Amino acid sequence: MTKSELIERLAGQQSHIPAKAVEDAVKEMLEHMAATLAEGERIEIRGFGSFSLHYRAPRVGRNPKTGDKVELDGKYVPHFKPGKELRDRANIYG
């Protein structure tokens, strides 16, 4: 599901709320989540999961075109850990 599909679905379910207001709310929520992660803070949504940053250590990579070795710096990457409720709901398809 893309962001626009999410907005469309939410707007369809909440017909009393203008679609533009739903779009603004979704964009604002995602912006706040991104800003919170950028500050190094963890986000926890009970029953859904948690977002945090994980550190990736420096390593030697490889240029796929030339095959040359490339030094890659360490960096922080976003990480999502699903909550128990979400894992249980997803397992009905597994």
UniProtKB/Swiss-Prot annotation:
<dbReference type="InterPro" id="IPR010992">
    <property type="entry name" value="IHF-like_DNA-bd_dom_sf"/>
</dbReference>
<comment type="subunit">
    <text>Heterodimer of an alpha and a beta chain.</text>
</comment>
<protein>
    <recommendedName>
        <fullName>Integration host factor subunit beta</fullName>
    </recommendedName>
</protein>
<keyword id="KW-0233">DNA recombination</keyword>
<keyword id="KW-0804">Transcription</keyword>
<dbReference type="GO" id="GO:0006417">
    <property type="term" value="P:regulation of translation"/>
</dbReference>
<keyword id="KW-0805">Transcription regulation</keyword>
<dbReference type="Pfam" id="PF00216">
    <property type="entry name" value="Bac_DNA_binding"/>
</dbReference>
<dbReference type="GO" id="GO:0006310">
    <property type="term" value="P:DNA recombination"/>
</dbReference>
<keyword id="KW-0810">Translation regulation</keyword>
<keyword id="KW-0238">DNA-binding</keyword>
<comment type="similarity">
    <text>Belongs to the bacterial histone-like protein family.</text>
</comment>
<comment type="function">
    <text>This protein is one of the two subunits of integration host factor, a specific DNA-binding protein that functions in genetic recombination as well as in transcriptional and translational control.</text>
</comment>
<dbReference type="InterPro" id="IPR000119">
    <property type="entry name" value="Hist_DNA-bd"/>
</dbReference>
<dbReference type="GO" id="GO:0030527">
    <property type="term" value="F:structural constituent of chromatin"/>
</dbReference>
<dbReference type="GO" id="GO:0005694">
    <property type="term" value="C:chromosome"/>
</dbReference>
<dbReference type="InterPro" id="IPR020816">
    <property type="entry name" value="Histone-like_DNA-bd_CS"/>
</dbReference>
<dbReference type="GO" id="GO:0003677">
    <property type="term" value="F:DNA binding"/>
</dbReference>
<dbReference type="GO" id="GO:0006355">
    <property type="term" value="P:regulation of DNA-templated transcription"/>
</dbReference>
<dbReference type="InterPro" id="IPR005685">
    <property type="entry name" value="IHF_beta"/>
</dbReference>
<dbReference type="GO" id="GO:0005829">
    <property type="term" value="C:cytosol"/>
</dbReference>
